[in-house]
Curated annotation (Swiss-Prot):
Protein name: Small ribosomal subunit protein bS6
Domain of life (superkingdom): Bacteria
This protein's record includes keyword Ribonucleoprotein: yes
Spans traversing the lipid bilayer: none
UniProt GO cellular component terms: cytosolic small ribosomal subunit
Family annotation (PANTHER family): MITOCHONDRIAL 28S RIBOSOMAL PROTEIN S6, SMALL RIBOSOMAL SUBUNIT PROTEIN BS6M
Reported function: Binds together with bS18 to 16S ribosomal RNA.
One GO BP: translation
Xref: InterPro entries: Ribosomal_bS6, Ribosomal_bS6_sf, Ribosomal_S6_plastid/chlpt, Transl_elong_EF1B/ribsomal_bS6
Family according to the record: Belongs to the bacterial ribosomal protein bS6 family.
Organism: Rhizobium etli (strain CIAT 652)
Disordered as annotated region, ranges: 96-152
Gene name, Swiss-Prot/TrEMBL: rpsF
């Protein structure tokens, strides 16, 4: 049997209990076809980068699966039929990762230094250019226009 990581996105208007029921349904499909489901993570309701089937948010779920290819094909077939599943992706892996996935790990932002004064430094000088004057658009005297020949 092969090892897989499977992630699917469920519609935003279903509840968390319905997402758990979907996970259990697909877990049952895998087990009925001779596979095992290891870690199951529910990442919750997250914003999508772009709309998928008129949804701006989706419930994310991850499953670590040890199953034959036929079990994965059957699960994906049922996901294509289901209206609650927006997208899914199954990836074959060498081994399953231990511990929580990257989406569930708390990001430690303390290692960043303080950001004093924004992230841009002071304006640099451009050598022979005069200093910039904001709002002062005077560029010196302008010569008079020549008379137009085509005026009637």
């Amino acid at each position: 049997m092969a090892l897989y990581e499977h992630v699917f996105l469920a519609r935003q208007d279903i509840s968390a209990q319905q997402v758990d029921a979907l996970v259990e349904q697909y877990k049952g499909v895998i087990e009925a076809n001779g596979g095992k489901v290891g870690r199951i993570e529910n990442w919750g309701l997250k914003s999508l980068t772009y709309r998928i089937k008129k949804n701006r948010k989706a419930h994310y779920a991850l499953m670590d699966i040890d199953a034959p290819a036929a079990a994965i094909q059957e699960m994906e077939r049922q996901m294509r039929i289901s209206e609650d599943v927006l997208r899914y992706m199954t990836i074959a892996v060498e081994k399953h990762e231990e511990g929580p996935s990257a989406m569930l790990q708390k990001r430690d932002r303390d290692d960043r230094g303080p950001r004093e004064g924004g992230d841009r430094g002071p304006r640099r000088e451009f050598g022979d250019r005069p200093p910039r004057r904001d709002g002062d658009f005077q560029r010196g005297p302008r010569p008079d226009r020549a008379p137009r020949e085509d005026r009637a």
